[in-house]
Structures are given as C-alpha cells and as structure tokens.
Amino acid sequence: MAAPPKAWKAEYAKSGRASCKSCRSPIAKDQLRLGKMVQASQFDGFMPMWNHARCIFSKKNQIKSVDDVEGIDALRWDDQEKIRNYVGSASAGTSSTAAPPEKCTIEIAPSARTSCRRCSEKITKGSVRLSAKLESEGPKGIPWYHANCFFEVSPSATVEKFSGWDTLSDEDKRTMLDLVKKDVGNNEQNKGSKRKKSENDIDSYKSARLDESTSEGTVRNKGQLVDPRGSNTSSADIQLKLKEQSDTLWKLKDGLKTHVSAAELRDMLEANGQDTSGPERHLLDRCADGMLFGALGPCPVCANGMYYYNGQYQCSGNVSEWSKCTYSATEPVRVKKKWQIPHGTKNDYLMKWFKSQKVKKPERVLPPMSPEKSGSKATQRTSLLSSKGLDKLRFSVVGQSKEAANEWIEKLKLAGANFYARVVKDIDCLIACGELDNENAEVRKARRLKIPIVREGYIGECVKKNKMLPFDLYKLENALESSKGSTVTVKVKGRSAVHESSGLQDTAHILEDGKSIYNATLNMSDLALGVNSYYVLQIIEQDDGSECYVFRKWGRVGSEKIGGQKLEEMSKTEAIKEFKRLFLEKTGNSWEAWECKTNFRKQPGRFYPLDVDYGVKKAPKRKDISEMKSSLAPQLLELMKMLFNVETYRAAMMEFEINMSEMPLGKLSKENIEKGFEALTEIQNLLKDTADQALAVRESLIVAASNRFFTLIPSIHPHIIRDEDDLMIKAKMLEALQDIEIASKIVGFDSDSDESLDDKYMKLHCDITPLAHDSEDYKLIEQYLLNTHAPTHKDWSLELEEVFSLDRDGELNKYSRYKNNLHNKMLLWHGSRLTNFVGILSQGLRIAPPEAPVTGYMFGKGLYFADLVSKSAQYCYVDRNNPVGLMLLSEVALGDMYELKKATSMDKPPRGKHSTKGLGKTVPLESEFVKWRDDVVVPCGKPVPSSIRSSELMYNEYIVYNTSQVKMQFLLKVRFHHKR
C-alpha cells in the first residue's frame, strides 16, 4: 500500500464535528488539532485520527520529528513553536534536543561505524563525537553527533561538564571551547538584530527584509538558505524572518476573513488569474500569498494554477485525464505587476490595502531544509535513504542466482541497511531472489522464527521510495496463499458472471437487457496520490426473475483488508436507474457512452472501466469428467494436462503481480491489452525524448502514462515506469497475457467448465503426435539437444522426455511458398513460457503487435530463433518446483541473411535480404551439421569459438519478420536439472 506523505497532519479544525481520539471530547472549530495518519479500512487512502494538540502534547514521544508533521508551516507561529518544543527542537527540521550535562558524553570516536544523528554522515575514527541520551530516545542506542552538528542544536551546552571531558587532549578541549564561544556569539548577534515590526502597516513587510544578503558561508538553493557544509550558520536569522512572515500572513488572513466575503475572495482571485475553486480557507491562503508576494504564474507543465503547501509551490491541475500534475517549485514564476482587487468593489478594507500596496513584492522565505536534505551533494543519496529508515533495516537474502542476490545486497548496504549472511532472530525480513526454494535451510529457519519472507521487488521499491516499507504486500507467503484462495471464482451464466462475494452466483445471473449487460469492473491507479483502487458494479437478477439486486464492491487492488461491499434489493427499473447513476458518479460518463464506445472519455480523478471478456456460452455440462475415457495417446494426454492446468496460469498471473482477487483469470480482453501496449509505447517515446522536453514536463507525462498502464492492467504493485528494463518486462508480461487470454477461451478457467481434455485438444486445431523414442527423428532431436548446450549456461542441464510432431491447421499452406522459393532452411530452437503454448499451438508464433514498444528487441520486432538449445531454453522460465518446460523446433526459411554484430533497430532487413542473423562469438561446429528431409539444415554441432571478431553477441540469433516463413515441426517436453 502507499505510504502517507507524512505520519502526522496539523491544522485548525474546519468544524466542531470531530472528536478527539484521546479524550473523546469534541474538537472546537478553529482549534489546533493533530491527526495521526492511518490506512483507511473502508477506502483506498489514508485518513487522520484527530486529537486535541494538548492531548498529544501530554503524551511522550508521539511525534518523532517536525519533519513528520504535514502542514506545520501553515500554522500560526506560536502553534508551530508548540510542536517544535514538544519534539524538542528550537528550529524547524531538527529532532535533537538539549539534555542535562550529566546525561551527555564526549569522546574520541574509536571507529567509523557510527553516523551523526543530525547530518547522517559517518563520524570518522579519531574525531570528537558527542551524545545526548534522552528518555524519549527509547532503546535505539546512543545518538552520536559531530561536534559542529551538536552545537548547532545545543549552542549553550556546558561541554566541560560532559562525561568524558577529562579524557580529551588539551588541543581537542580548546577546539570544543572555541566552537561553543563561536556559536554563542552568533546567537547573541542574531538576537541583537531583531526589530519590532509595525502592527499597523501590513505592507511594511519590506522586500529588503527578505532579500538581505546571507551570512558568509551560505548559498541560496531554490529559495532556501543552505550552508554548503551542511550547517546553517544563519538559522536564527531565518527563524526570525519566518516568524515575521508568518505573523504578517496571519494578520492579513485574519483581516480578509473579517472584512471580505467568500464571493469577494473568488472575484479577487479571478481578477488576478488564480484558481477560484475550493473552500474559504483555501481562498484565504491563495489571496494572502498573492497580496503579499504577487500573483502566481501558471504551471509550466499543464498551465493550471499553483498554490503553496508544505514548503513549496505545487500545481493544482491535471497533466492529463490519467494523472494529476506532479510539478512543484520553490521559486515559482510571479506576475510582475500589482495585485488587483475586484473591479468596482466598495469594500473599504480592500481599497485601503490597495492604496498602500507596493509594486515590488518580497520573495517568500521558505522553511530551511532538514539536515538530511541539506548535506553535501556527495552524500545526498546516502543521507536521504538513511534518514527514511533504511539504516534500520536488518535483512538476509536467499536465492538461486548468487549474482542477483549480491547485486541487491550491495544496493541495500549502500543505502545503509544491515546485511546478515545467515537468518537470525533479530533480522526484519528474508528477501527471496527468484523462485522460493521451500527446502532451503534459511527459508525453513525464517518460517520457524516467523520472520517475513518477501519478494525481491521489495528491495527495488524501498530504494525507489528511499525508505523502509511495510512488508504486508510484499510477503511471498501471503501472495502464495492469495493465489490459492483469493482468485475470484467465475461462474458464467449467459454473457457474464456474478461476483462470488455477493453470495448469489449459484442462484442468480447478471441482468441482460437487449445488448446491455449490467456488469462493470472499474479501476483507477494514480501513482502521484498513491491510489490503486477497484470498483465492481453489477445488477444481479434471480434465476426465477423474482428479485433484482444492485451489488457493488470496492477497495484497494491486492488487499482484502481495505474496502467494502453492498448488496441492495430493488425493482428492475430502480436497479437500472441506480446502476447508471453510480456508473456516472464513478467514471464521469454515462453508461450508454461506454456501451456504445462513443463519446466516452476518461475523466481526471475518476475510474475507468475494464474490458472483461467472459467468452461465449460453454458446451453442455457433463456429470463427471474424471470418469470420461480419452482417446488420446498417454503421452499426449499428459501434455494436455500440462497445457490445461489452471494452477499454472494462476502462478503466472501472480508472478506478473496482476490483481487476481477482482480480475477473473484470463478475462482481461484483447482490447485492454492493446491499450496497455499503447501506454508502454508512449512511455518508451518519453524515455527517449530527453532533449525536446523539460525534465519536469517529461516526468509528469511519464507518471500519467504509468497511471494509464496500471489502470488498464490492474497490478498489486503499480509504480512509475522509468527505465528501459522495466518497460521490457511489462511488454513481455502483456505478450504473455495475450496468450493467457487466448488460453482462457480454450482451457475454460470457469469454475463449472467441464469439457474433456479431448474436446480442448480439438480446439487447438493442431495435430500433435508423439514420436517413438527409437525413431530417427527422436534420436536426431535428442542429439541436437545434448550437443548444443552453451558453455555459459551452467545453472542447469536438460533432459529430453518427449517429442511431438506438429501440424497446425493451415500453417503448411502459408509456409509452402517460402519453402519452395527460399534457400537456406534450418531447424531452429524457440523457447517460451508454458502458459504461452496454448496460444502458440492454436495460432502459431506471432510477432509483437504494432502498438507494442520496440524495447527489448535487438533487431526489431520479429520471430527470434537460436541454434544452441540453452539459448532458447532460458525463455521457458522454469524453476525447481516446476522443472518441466516446453520448447519448439521450427523449420525456418531464412533465405539471404542480413548479418550483424551488434543490436540494430529495424522494422525489417534491407531489400534483397529475407532474414537477420546476429553473429555470435560461439557457434555450433559446422562439420557436425546434418540434413533433415533433404534440404533442411540441423546445426547440431558442439559449441566452438567462431571466426567472428568484435561481435557484441555471445551466440547466434536468427530473426524473420514474416510468420509465413516459419513451420512449427516439433514440440519438446524438456526437464531442467538445476545444479544449485
């Protein structure tokens, strides 16, 4: 689930309706309240649990840091100070506090293992370090600081009374005393520079006060004063300016609230080209900001309005119908003219203010960055990560691939996490890289100690989001249970299926009225807001026509704990009316627009319907499929059981992190998958287009396209697709989903589908005949498999179990033209997932559709083959638990080949060439090649170094761009023997 922006929220109560969660008494309107952000149980989002501020202040250690409080800089200064004082810091952004000298320690660092609590950088061995252990710190260990960092937050510390003072050298003592004197001197100077502000003239807040030169050693960084060494030597001066600024803003807002109506506020905002939407408190904020600092220019990304919140200016608009605009700035563009008041206004307060207005406006002073954000550039990445809690993560890793495991270990160690080579009771989680081996000793130990076992995607999300995330949605054990028990059970009646959560799937059906099928599955993913929601809407009619119900179910994708459902009985007419009302409310479009696929337009912040294809009516039910005899050969019968095993498809969907709790297995329509390809292609174009668009614009458009993809293809863990590797993975996932969609119509994933395996075999429209193990073809294929294992593929060996000859309906007729007219025909390998083979056998090998991105294809979109078996076997994606895969041997008419030594983007080879060959550095020994059926070459020689120099390819690849150049000849059932 998405993490809340901050753990706490501070504001003045909008009404008097909320009650304090601590004392249970009402929180009066305009009273300061503090809300702890928690995951809502009834909707996909976070909600504040409101408390009186005084109730929180009466408890210890509730708020860990000022940085954890959203909206603190929008409060009155006195209320800001109350929160800072509670946390224990006299300045915004720090979480340290003063402590009695007897509880403080000073010493020479014996090693470089500790990090400074303020700046998060390492404390070098032999340097002076200080600590102030407080009761509020709890059992976290001693918080150590650099000397400079300690005196910034405790400038008046009596260091001579610290424990360990006498152990320092005379030189170190002099250095410490000089630091104390310097810091005290700076504070005294700052205190003496305070001036009393005029109470009568709002505009007396002069630009000179905000733009005066900074003290030596500081630089301006995006509107904030930051010391390049990580210490802000003018923090007291900034605090003074922030106090004066806050007092001035609140004086102005109080005056506007007293003397200006909400309608006049909107008129004033409209006169200055500002956003006029929202409640009165938002209007007051925008007006006060504009009157004091000048009217804001439009967002450079989407041209919508900007507003100030949480230390920066953010866009209030949408970059597209799929996403909110993510643009933000600390130095927004301001309109270089006076702030206008409504034309013809008679409001004395506004007219008096307008006459006193100065043309030159001051620049808004922003709160200083937190210590972890203001460090040196060299340590910015590490500081950010450790400040968010990755330095607290204790983990161990298990996996079949040591290279992948070591890569993740290094990434997390770089981020500050603590790696354990073995599972011990103190670690937080065990990270599984690749398939989980249930027999692994570390896995068994983790289960015994009840340590969460999480998938490797958890690491990537932690690193991307720069913090330690909850384990719940990444637990591999939970996902396995979900795949077994939470996949929706579909009982198709007519043209649709009643949702099983309604409890009516056995006695009722979805209402159909002519062409209308009153069933909708809606989805919405917004990565900027952390939203990943679904909404199911159905009209359910009893089979006897006696009653009608409107059923709705909603929640967060992949979570059974968040959401709810409702079943309401009503007449047929009322049910249709209510269904259409809810559809309009959730999507912003009429039901008729979706049915007719005309004038339907995705609306910002609204759901989008998914195309769910339940297929046609099934064959008549049979009583007991297990008792039915099969006419298929035993080897073929076992193959059909492999191909039509529903659990295999469920496992694939789980691997892809597709939402199976609300998305019927295999029912995502072809149209939806094509739209998913289009979204990926848009992302690919944005990733390539680095010159023509500003970074902020490109980022917003990438977020919008990612939202679009994960709305169309519901996923448990949506994220922003930022790189080519991730894009390629998603494209391959969609290709696999296409085959699963095809398989769903043949396999029959419905719970009451009971066709025999013979019936399903007939639906493949492909003659499949097992070969005798003593036949010439079988022996040749076995030799080909055993000889052509590449030397670098050492993790497994291959054993041939069965070979089947193939004759797909119509394929030979299409191939005959190329067979007769092209020379250079070869029998080549092709590997694919088990879940893809129903689609392959029934429709042949297919080239990626035009709407798919070209990412991941070395030589463009085509059909790829290999002459070394292990090169293709990699794409079977088998594991220890399911070690049997399927492979193809196809006759490929290559003709004249376009030979290349490195990846080259193309749609097809040049004129006169019929295929492309990527030249590898290791090839089959040509002297061992044999001819099959007179003119087809079988490159079954052992791998040897080639004569090709400077090639970027390890092994040969063969690519054709026309499916008619391929004739599938053999299907192989292969067992993988994993060596580790």
Curated annotation (Swiss-Prot):
Location of the protein in the cell: Nucleus
Domain SAP, chain residue ranges per copy: 257-291
Bias type Basic and acidic residues, positions: 198-212
Chain positions of all zinc fingers (PARP-type): 8-91, 104-184
Chain segments carrying region Zinc ribbon: 294-338
Gene Ontology cellular component annotations, sorted alphabetically: nucleolus
Keywords, ordered alphabetically: ADP-ribosylation, DNA-binding, Glycosyltransferase, Metal-binding, NAD, Nucleotidyltransferase, Nucleus, Repeat, Transferase, Zinc, Zinc-finger
UniProt superkingdom: Eukaryota
Residues binding Zn(2+) 3: C299, C302, C315, C325
Catalytic activity entry: NAD(+) + (ADP-D-ribosyl)n-acceptor = nicotinamide + (ADP-D-ribosyl)n+1-acceptor + H(+); L-aspartyl-[protein] + NAD(+) = 4-O-(ADP-D-ribosyl)-L-aspartyl-[protein] + nicotinamide; L-glutamyl-[protein] + NAD(+) = 5-O-(ADP-D-ribosyl)-L-glutamyl-[protein] + nicotinamide
Family per similarity comment: Belongs to the ARTD/PARP family.
Protein name, as recorded: Poly [ADP-ribose] polymerase 1
Species of provenance: Zea mays (Maize)
Gene label: PARP1
